[in-house]
């Protein structure tokens, strides 16, 4: 959270030197990044489906109408997970959550250096709301933004978007 690269060292926990030390002065200079990480951590806590204790089965074993976890591409419910794949959508069905929060969570990844469009699965009476767009100047939305289209999302290059599916807010 404080831009501590550890000079690429993934095992800095065992080093008592500047590689492993955290420079807390960076926190003042990067308050926006720290606020973003705090918001994402709070989002994850609020959506227990993202940290399920049960392994995902990729099937609708509780007959909620959706599998617990599904992958999506340019077409909903269809994706090729192949070598050249540059974008991917993952739908976590909130009905499988062991909490009161039953919101669906869709995480969309665009690894490509150009705009990529991913299909959004139809949610029946629910609508899609954008919560995070990593390519925006302010990536985390304090209030989820209703999507103009519930059919697809056009993602900026090399970005991650997080959407929630919930009943329409009026």
Predicted features, each with a name:
Residues 2-170:
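Carbohydrate-interacting/catalytic domains
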């Amino acid at each position: 959270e404080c831009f501590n690269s550890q000079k690429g060292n993934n095992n800095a926990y065992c080093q008592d030197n500047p590689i492993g030390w955290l420079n807390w002065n960076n926190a003042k200079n990067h308050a926006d990044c720290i606020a973003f990480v705090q918001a994402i951590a709070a989002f994850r806590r609020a959506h227990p489906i993202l940290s399920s204790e049960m392994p995902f089965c990729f099937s609708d074993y509780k007959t909620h109408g959706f599998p617990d976890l599904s992958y999506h591409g340019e077409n909903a419910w269809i994706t090729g997970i192949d070598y050249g794949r540059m974008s991917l959508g993952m739908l976590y069905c909130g009905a499988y959550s062991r909490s009161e929060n039953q919101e669906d969570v869709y995480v969309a990844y665009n690894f490509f250096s150009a705009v990529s469009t991913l299909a959004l699965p139809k949610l029946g009476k629910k609508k899609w709301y954008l919560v995070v767009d990593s390519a925006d100047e302010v990536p985390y939305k304090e209030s989820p933004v209703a999507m103009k289209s519930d059919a697809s999302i056009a993602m900026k290059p090399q970005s991650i978007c997080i959407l929630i599916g919930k009943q329409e807010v009026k």
